[in-house]
Amino acid sequence: MQQNGRTYIAIDLKAFYASVECMERGLDPLTTNLVVADASRTEKTICLAVSPSLKAYGISGRARLFEVVERVKEVNAERRRKAGCLSEKSFNANELAAYPSREVDYLIAPPRMAKYIQISSQIYNVYLKYIAPEDIHVYSIDEVMMDVTNYLQTYRMTACELAKVMISDVLHTTGITATAGIGSNLYLCKVAMDIMAKHVQPDKDGVRIAELDEMSYREQLWAHRPLTDFWRVGRGYAKKLEAIGI
């Protein structure tokens, strides 16, 4: 994808804080039920991260701890209804899928920001193996955007191939996987990652990559709702836009 002469890649580390905590415990981030939260506070505390296997039960990435507790209770009530009774607990998604009579459990990891910053820096150094720092925009601790225009010919790769190589390197270096978006400008690569990649079938490592240009954006997202899915569109803007029919 190289419309208007430029190509951009956005990369978002998957459930970053939760993935770091899983790796620190020698657990698979994709199959371990884990939330990052300060359990010493009340159950109203906000979870900083929720692992993908817990999100699969309909728990949001920024749930309050009591919402996690209640949802897991509901899941176990349904499992109990089907199995008759539940035996031992498990926080492993593969085990829970294989043994319907096991009770869904999860780990609560207290936040460790210094550790997350350390791992984020390690991952940034992986990106620097492929892309110069002036072409990398660090958007947050777990997300970057890159102008890869001048690298595709050098590496003789498509943007998708380059994204896969970098994500694979991050995975082998840290055990953490990611989602990527590719676009002909920064906005499109971000939206491709935030919206379109969610509907892409993940590969064996859980990686999803989606692409957008101006034409495919119009074709696939012109009527997309809710508007708050789009980058930088909050509830206030969405309400105003919907009021004028947009």
Q: Could you describe each region identified by the protein language model?
A:
Residues M1-I246:
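Gly/Gly-Pro- and Ser/Thr-rich, intrinsically disordered tail segments characteristic of DNA damage-repair
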